[in-house]
Amino acid sequence: EYTHAASGARLCWLEREDENKSFCAAFRTLPYDDTGVFHILEHSVLCGSKQFPVKEPFVELMKGSLNTFLNALTFPDKTCYPVASRNSRDFLNLMRVYLDAVFFPSIHEKPEIFQQEGWHYELHDGVLTRSGVVLNEMKGAFADADELLINAMSRALFPDSPYRFVSGGDPEAIPSLTYEAFTAAHKRFYHPANSYLLLDGSIDQDESFALLDGYLSQFAAIDPDTQIHAQPPVRA
């Protein structure tokens, strides 16, 4: 395990003779409301970045990369961006695209990404409605009784904890998220000091570490203040 001196990022390298090389950038993203801001961020950072200003780099990688795994995942307390490939050049390119996406996404210059992936108004035949990729996804999720039960149990069991919130977003709360709060969440939580990076497999250490350092060295270490505190006992 390593710590990047300049940025405070932590890295775990599992040195194994496995040709399937893997990389993951993970961030501790503790929800503070039901707006699903981290779910929307997970979608949005993969909609173009500083070095890769295309509309959907994720889709381009799906079409042209030799990847064996490519995804982004939102959990109740973290967001992960894993990639894998057996081809060394392809693996480094996947790392580069994902690092650029999480640290330098186009969301700060293009509010339309937030509107597309989060929520926006639409007018059809004189009827004003709300739409958005994540909003519509969570409307579908909330149509499942099991999902509603799990959310209710989390609120009851963790009333003083981030786990009481719906990390994916409550369709009733998502439209209250502003663009300003959205970009502020990225600046606060997507900092190397709040990240945990993972490398696994038969990688070229010098090339991989140099690529990581090129991105991480652009940040100064901070205290991210994202500790998870234990839930005090709850009286039934």
Segments (PLM) and residue ranges:
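N- or domain-start disorder-to-order transition segments that initiate the globular core
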Residues: 1-18
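Short pre-active-site segment immediately N-terminal to the catalytic Zn-binding motif
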Residues: 26-36
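Active-site recognition of the HExxH zinc-binding catalytic motif
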Residues: 35-47
